Structures are given as structure tokens and as C-alpha cells.
Amino acid sequence: MSVLSLKPRAGADDVDALMREIGRRARAASRRMALVPARAKDMALRAAAAAIRDAAPVILEANAADLAEARGANLPAATLDRLALTPGRVEAIAAAVEAIAGLPDPVGRQLAAFERPNGLAIERISTPLGVVGVIYESRPNVTADAGALCLKAGNAAVLRAGSESLRSAAAIARAMADGLAAQGLPAEAIQLVPTRDRAAVGAMLAGLDGCIDVIVPRGGKSLVARVQSEARVPVFAHLEGICHVFVHARADLAMAREILRNSKLRRTGICGAAETLLVDRACAGTHLAPLVADLLEAGCAVRGDAETQAVDPRVTPATEADWRTEYLDAVIAVRVVDGLDAAIDHVETYGSHHTDAIVTADEAAAERFLAEVDSAIVVHNASTQFADGGEFGFGAEIGIATGRMHARGPVGVEQLTTFKYRVHGSGQVRP
């Protein structure tokens, strides 16, 4: 996994052989990791964090090379910021690994237990998923975050970093593997794909001959769409975060203003940022104008329906496309709706099943919204930007999942496990 061995392109046969070998090693490592006691995993993660700190000069040197290449390719400033590492950011990466080590062990928990009339004692026990493939773009810190979460849950990780961050990711992955090996755990439990060749992504999506159990994409819409379309293994992901704030007729105006400002503007570029504001017509006369004014005064562009345009000349007309747009910027779409039913219909028509919020003092209305909106995270009287594994107390997350199978919402260490049934008998046979 040496940085010096990274190649921009390799022959198709070479990539195929490389990926098969990575998959084989990951599967073997996953079998060992599944049996590692909690204390040993935690010690290994702390050793990995220490190795990252010790390797900081090497990591920063690799990152400088990545940044120089990215600037030469005229990549956007936002991409450069996500790619850039500093001594402080490297320390934050190491601290995040230590925080994951401090989480409760998700493996070996008894999830259920019962006894059958014939005397069979049955228990459901949490177990690792196996091998987790993570495909991500420009953030080098995902290497450590995703790797540590997978390892904490007793899994092996196969990591495919974006081409722009490959040197940085390789240096971080090598440090983590060194930390594992120092504690007697398999270094192959965290493997970075050491090539920029896109055929490697295709091999991962095909499952590496049955060696990958689940794929997690971290990146832009085009990456996630490709993974969801082409993967032959389960995917934990969300395509978009078209998140809504619905201000109900019985919403406290001061609360609604604070929640909306935070939901939209705390960080506009994250998947939990609100992209659409819905205002109940019953309170629009008192609530709509101040809500819109707050956004505009904070530098947020507002695209609204006719009623929203009427309250402020700075509002531009919303189109049908606006209701379906994840802006990831200081832009929001605003619509006045005819009550709770219309709000739920709008969210179900245009939403992405990520995170949606209602602001109201009416508990019955809140319960209906929470029950009927089919999103991974539904919120009452709080910001949509709490859609985060850390805020949920998960310590960290590998992503947000909006599917209906297995993981949904923030994917932390618990969601990176499955379960098995243990059946204890005393000689029973089935009649």
C-alpha cells in the first residue's frame, strides 16, 4: 500500500487480479476480526490513532502532493478545502478514532431471548456484517472514520478513495494498518485500493467474487447514483438530502424562526440542511413574512410560490424543479400549503426520505407528521441539522441511509452489524 507504488492506470487484468486479492485478504481478515474481544479492538484502535499522530509529517507531505495536483487540475475551491489537511485536522482524525474506540462494543449483544415449549432456548445475538466496501471522494478523513467504525464493529474494510485524495488516504490507511498490526490484529482488516483505475470501483460494485457484503458510498450525487444503480451487493446510502421544515398553524413564531435559520444556514452544504420551507396557510399571515425576511437578511436566496413572492420583492419565482432540488447552498424554496395533509403530500411527492421536520405546539399534528412522513429521520420542534451520527450519540457515522432494508438514518457501529440466532437444546429432535 505504499504511496510510491500508486499508479494512475493499470491494465484490466492487473486491476482484476489486484481486486480479487484484496477481496480474498479482506474476507480472511473479517473472519479473524469477528472473534476479536472488545478490549483488543479498542486497544488496536487507540494504537491506530497513535500511529496517525506519529505519521502526521508523512500524511501532510502526501496531502501537499495531492493538493498540488488538484490545484494544477483547477479543481473547485470547495473540493480543495475538503481535501486539505492541516496539523489540526490530522489531530482531529486521530481523536475521532479514539472516540470510536470508546464506544460500547456493538458485537455479541443479546438482542432477544426466549424459550420454546419444547425447551429450546433461543437468543438473537449481534454479529459483524463481514466485509464493508467504502467508496468515497475527496475527504481523506473518511479513510480513518470509515475504517475505525468498520473495525469497531468487527468488520474488515475495503476503502476506495477518490483519485484526488489517494496519496493522503494511503498514508492514513497505512498508519492505521500499522496500529492494528502492532496489537496483533490483521493489517488486512483495513485495505486501501492502491490505484486510480475506475475499473476497481466496478470490481467492488460487483462484490469482489462474493467477498464484499455491503457497499457504502460517500460523495456527490453522481457517485451515489452509480453505486445504487450498478451495485450487486446491498448499499447503505442516500442519493439526496431534500429536507423540509413545515411550519404548522400552531407553531410558535420565535421557535420557528430559530429552527429555520439553523436548519438552512448553520451549514448549507451538508445533507441535513433544509432545502424547502412549507408554511401552513392558517399562519402565513403572521409567520411567512418574518421567516422569509430572516432568510433574505442572512444572505439566503428565496425562491417562492406566488404567496411567498407577495411578501417580499426579493423573492424570485420557484419552478417545479426547485421543489426537487438539493441546493447545498444558501438557497431555499418556499411554499404556502393548505394544512398538515398538504404538507405531508408535498414531502412525500418531492422529498428524498432523508430528514423532515415539523414545528408545532399541536402534539396530535406532530404525531401524524412523524407517523405519515416516510423519511429515515422525522423531527418535531428541532433543526434538521441534527441528522448526524454524532448528534444521535453514535460517536460517528459512516453515512446516512435512506433505504428501508437493514440500516436507516445515521449508520454508526450498531448499524454495521447483523445478527444470528443461537439455539440451545438438550437433545430435542423435530417430530
Curated annotation (Swiss-Prot):
Pfam families cross-referenced by the UniProt entry: Aldedh
GO biological process per UniProt: L-proline biosynthetic process
Disulfide bonds listed in the record: none
Keyword Zinc attached: no
Intracellular or extracellular location(s): Cytoplasm
EC number assigned by the record: 1.2.1.41
Catalytic activity: L-glutamate 5-semialdehyde + phosphate + NADP(+) = L-glutamyl 5-phosphate + NADPH + H(+)
Role: Catalyzes the NADPH-dependent reduction of L-glutamate 5-phosphate into L-glutamate 5-semialdehyde and phosphate. The product spontaneously undergoes cyclization to form 1-pyrroline-5-carboxylate.
Family in the record: Belongs to the gamma-glutamyl phosphate reductase family.
Protein name in the entry: Gamma-glutamyl phosphate reductase
Gene name per UniProt: proA
